[in-house]
Amino acid sequence: MKSIGINGYGTIGKRVADAVSAQDDMKIVGVTKRTPDYEAKAAVEKGYDLYISVPERESQFEEAGIEVAGTADELFEKLDLVVDCTPGGIGAQNKTDIYEKIGLKAIFEGGEDHDAIGSSFNAEANYADNIGEDYVRVVSCNTTGLCRTLKPIYDISGIKKVRAVMVRRGADPSDVKKGPINSIVPTTEVPSHHGPDVQTIIDDINVMTMALLVPTTLMHTHNIMVELEDKITTDDVLDAFENAHRVLPVQKSLKLGSTAEIMEYAKDLGRSRGDMYEIPVWKESVNIENGELFYMQAVHQESDVVPENVDAIRAMLELEEDGEKSILKTNKAMGIL
């Protein structure tokens, strides 16, 4: 049983903590917080030992009635690996200032640059490449979504070119300080970072992405166009999606024609926090015209990367050499379809 810690018990960190706790070959030793907020309080109430990353704030936690087990540095000494879920840029700094100095393996999230970490991870696409690695970056929610559906297409047909438009949610549901509220905000930088990010996983894929923000909090959606190498049918694509791990073909005809209905479905499945770990692909959107594949998918930005973190732990700590076995083990423990 390997000892795992979470540095940054926020939107992703708290979900990874629960996912690790559901496994039988790893355990959560502790989690860290900077401020005494409801997430810190909930962590203690759930039974996680809470460590503070700013020791000078211990009195603030005491005043809030939140029990502290020690400092982040004390937690790190107890771990086989830390999952760093701190805001983008801080993780890379922690890698240099802390983890490398004490010889602690670490996983980082998609807010970090690939070059700063050295290796990027997607369980289906490059698990084997990350076996035994010391520092690995789990790519962002959007990049994870693209990799999950492009990889099976790549395998059955080959891909000449991908063009994708990312319709991104404006903020997470709990983030009251961000927007937009009544606006659509284009990301005028082209390509958006998502295309180059996919290439850190599937390096020989030709992919170009554009993105925009819209006033919703539920999910991202992707409109994807793929020029195929070989002639295949829509049934071939749908079969590939059906057989792919963590991809969920859904039907508008079953009243799953919107992100709101998909997230309601996740709640009806009894998912913790109403999470949708899989990438829903609308079956009715899958079409091939003149050798070009079109489809639409959704991405739950708060949770699709969570099982990837679990598989990355197994790869880095060499708990399982077979990526598919790790994926299936994680899926079973988390109730992933």
From Swiss-Prot:
<keyword id="KW-0324">Glycolysis</keyword>
<keyword id="KW-0963">Cytoplasm</keyword>
<dbReference type="GO" id="GO:0004365">
    <property type="term" value="F:glyceraldehyde-3-phosphate dehydrogenase (NAD+) (phosphorylating) activity"/>
</dbReference>
<keyword id="KW-0560">Oxidoreductase</keyword>
<dbReference type="InterPro" id="IPR020829">
    <property type="entry name" value="GlycerAld_3-P_DH_cat"/>
</dbReference>
<comment type="similarity">
    <text>Belongs to the glyceraldehyde-3-phosphate dehydrogenase family.</text>
</comment>
<dbReference type="InterPro" id="IPR020828">
    <property type="entry name" value="GlycerAld_3-P_DH_NAD(P)-bd"/>
</dbReference>
<feature type="binding site">
    <location>
        <position position="111"/>
    </location>
    <ligand>
        <name>NAD(+)</name>
    </ligand>
</feature>
<keyword id="KW-0520">NAD</keyword>
<feature type="binding site">
    <location>
        <begin position="140"/>
        <end position="142"/>
    </location>
    <ligand>
        <name>D-glyceraldehyde 3-phosphate</name>
    </ligand>
</feature>
<feature type="binding site">
    <location>
        <position position="169"/>
    </location>
    <ligand>
        <name>NAD(+)</name>
    </ligand>
</feature>
<keyword id="KW-0521">NADP</keyword>
<comment type="pathway">
    <text>Carbohydrate degradation; glycolysis; pyruvate from D-glyceraldehyde 3-phosphate: step 1/5.</text>
</comment>
<feature type="binding site">
    <location>
        <begin position="11"/>
        <end position="12"/>
    </location>
    <ligand>
        <name>NAD(+)</name>
    </ligand>
</feature>
<feature type="region of interest" description="Disordered">
    <location>
        <begin position="177"/>
        <end position="196"/>
    </location>
</feature>
<dbReference type="Pfam" id="PF02800">
    <property type="entry name" value="Gp_dh_C"/>
</dbReference>
<feature type="binding site">
    <location>
        <position position="301"/>
    </location>
    <ligand>
        <name>NAD(+)</name>
    </ligand>
</feature>
<dbReference type="InterPro" id="IPR020830">
    <property type="entry name" value="GlycerAld_3-P_DH_AS"/>
</dbReference>
<dbReference type="InterPro" id="IPR020831">
    <property type="entry name" value="GlycerAld/Erythrose_P_DH"/>
</dbReference>
<dbReference type="GO" id="GO:0047100">
    <property type="term" value="F:glyceraldehyde-3-phosphate dehydrogenase (NADP+) (phosphorylating) activity"/>
</dbReference>
<feature type="active site" description="Nucleophile">
    <location>
        <position position="141"/>
    </location>
</feature>
<dbReference type="GO" id="GO:0005737">
    <property type="term" value="C:cytoplasm"/>
</dbReference>
<dbReference type="GO" id="GO:0006096">
    <property type="term" value="P:glycolytic process"/>
</dbReference>
<dbReference type="InterPro" id="IPR036291">
    <property type="entry name" value="NAD(P)-bd_dom_sf"/>
</dbReference>
<protein>
    <recommendedName>
        <fullName>Glyceraldehyde-3-phosphate dehydrogenase</fullName>
        <ecNumber>1.2.1.59</ecNumber>
    </recommendedName>
</protein>
<dbReference type="InterPro" id="IPR006436">
    <property type="entry name" value="Glyceraldehyde-3-P_DH_2_arc"/>
</dbReference>
<feature type="binding site">
    <location>
        <begin position="194"/>
        <end position="195"/>
    </location>
    <ligand>
        <name>D-glyceraldehyde 3-phosphate</name>
    </ligand>
</feature>
<dbReference type="GO" id="GO:0050661">
    <property type="term" value="F:NADP binding"/>
</dbReference>
<dbReference type="GO" id="GO:0051287">
    <property type="term" value="F:NAD binding"/>
</dbReference>
<comment type="subunit">
    <text>Homotetramer.</text>
</comment>
